[in-house]
Amino acid sequence: ERLQFTTNVFANTFSQGGVSNFLELYIEFNDVAENYERGLDIKTGIAFSSYKSAFGLTKREAFFSYPDNVFAYRVETEKPKDLKVRAVIPYLGVRGADDGGRTGEIFANDGCIEIKGTLPSRNLSYDAKVAVITDGEKTIENGEIVVRNALCAVILLVFDTSYKLCPEAFSTHRAVGEDPTEKVASRLVAALKLGYEKLKERHIADFSSIMNRVEFDIGGRYDGRTTDELLSSYKEGNDEPYLEE
């Protein structure tokens, strides 16, 4: 599974392309999925998926918590299995340091993976840390977090940059904030202390307070078919008002 995280402070020297890929996480499982389903609960802001394999039913859910500034991802399975968590810094070497290019390295630090680098043309530094909580065995091998024989694993990601919103950021196009390393470390410690369920509870309370302000009904009846089934029927020329609404 590939997860992309974006930021709007990695603009290039031409002040274009402000939204950029900050970091990618690859989560690799040692199974083959069947009966795969996925969705997003727009009332709680939680993405979820499930599938069946030789390890039984696997359930995954993820959210980004605004109150705690942390991304949380949980996977649960009926039978113990393995997984790997690998971080990738995109666009390294694509541009030069003066043309919006970035530097970066990934290394193990205190039982976590740390991602650190700079955007020289913007005088910007960035930092991220990835931690895993699991009931299985956990090791760090070649810059990857490896989990074995686990029924449950929680992945936490915290990241930040030295960008500071101030007049100089617009007049000079260069960051004037502080190095984010300590800030990232303290956020991760706080998230680990809260634990997954508390992080989820705080996220839902925050997100739902906004989403529950309005409700609307677009009508129609849901007959239980999946999106791919509806699309196939639609391509065959059948009327599918559920797609058009």
Task: List each language-model region with its residue ranges.
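Aromatic-residue-lined binding/catalytic grooves and analogous aromatic/hydrophobic interfacial grooves
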Residues: 1-245
